[in-house]
Amino acid sequence: MVLKEFRQMRRDRRTVALMVGMPLMLLVIFGYAARFDVTDIETAVVGADAATVADALPPIYDVADIDAGADAADGRRMLRDSEVEAVVVADGAPPELLVDGSQLFVAQSALRRVPPGSTPEVLFNPELDTATVMVPSLIGFIMLFVGTVITSLGVVREREQGTLEQLAVMPLRPLDVAVGKIAPYFLVALFDMIIVTAAGLLIFDVPFEGSALLLAAYGLLFLFVVLGFGVAISTLSKSQGEAIQLAIMTLMPQIMLSGMIFPLDSMAAGVRWIGYLLPLTWFIVGMRGIFLKGSSFSALLPPLAILALMAVVVFGFALYRFRQDLAPKQTGDDAGPLDPVEVTA
């Protein structure tokens, strides 16, 4: 009986891949990414004494810019547009340390190592409230879950019940069928985004400093990405069990490596670059910039452009796979009539 079970397990390659791949993935994630203490804080030093003060900063402050002609207002703008994570204002008075509170662990690490004689000030999240930072990220997580898991299960269920094959023989274009199948999940995920956003603003008192138009643009592009994940998974799965397995393998890296839980700055370089390839990473960057900082359009445009590129690639691939699934399969019965065989005496 035991040998029979092992043979059955060996036939299910996706289960074997999940059993072997998931522990290895978790080991890598928690070994190289699960760190809350940030050791390098990208810093700008501004003011007349910028060069002198920069030389005296603790090693944790990675000085990326020294500008003696800039002032505190310029430093605040740099933080608002996510150009740096901390600014030291050295204008002759005791230095002032400005820290980006939207990056919770960066701010906490900076406050534990305040330069001697400096006065710290936390911007965008003065109380270092966890909910203020997490709610914008949770919007992306909920959209990711609904768009990936629920969509993939819904489409696979149609295939298991045979209704997807019925749609394939109806006088509808594959694109019409795809839009009809995806639209309900799009609307559900959009509704969830609105509900979570409203709850964050009303219940958790999360500030909203940016543009509602930019919020809508980020939300729509991210929806196309996650729905593309869901549809692509459904085309690669023969059952709901396989769809759940693939969805888990899609969700886990995005949750762990996007900066939602563990700060990107604390990750090893290779793992951090994996995080940069994940759409949730850029959605979170945009949401924190819109909600907490009121970042300028020019600062939010690069993450938005990356999301747009991902939406085109992922959703385009998903539609291509879905159209292939709907294409009529030629069977032996569909073959043309046999050529007559000449019988000779």
Named regions from a protein language model:
Residues 1-133, 324-345:
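Extracytoplasmic/periplasmic domains immediately adjacent to an N-terminal transmembrane anchor
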Residues 9, 148-170:
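Transmembrane helix boundary and interhelical loop/hinge segments in multi-pass membrane proteins
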Residues 28-40, 238-281:
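Transmembrane helix segments
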Residues 33-37, 152, 156-157, 200-208, ...:
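Short helix-capping/hinge motifs at transmembrane helix termini and TM-loop junctions
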Residues 73, 124-128, 207, 259-314, ...:
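Membrane-interfacial helix-loop-helix junctions in multi-pass membrane proteins
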Residues 134-153:
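Long, hydrophobic alpha-helical segments
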Residues 153, 157, 170, 201, ...:
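Transmembrane helix-loop junction
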Residues 174, 178-248, 252, 297-304, ...:
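Alpha-helical transmembrane segments and their short interhelical loops
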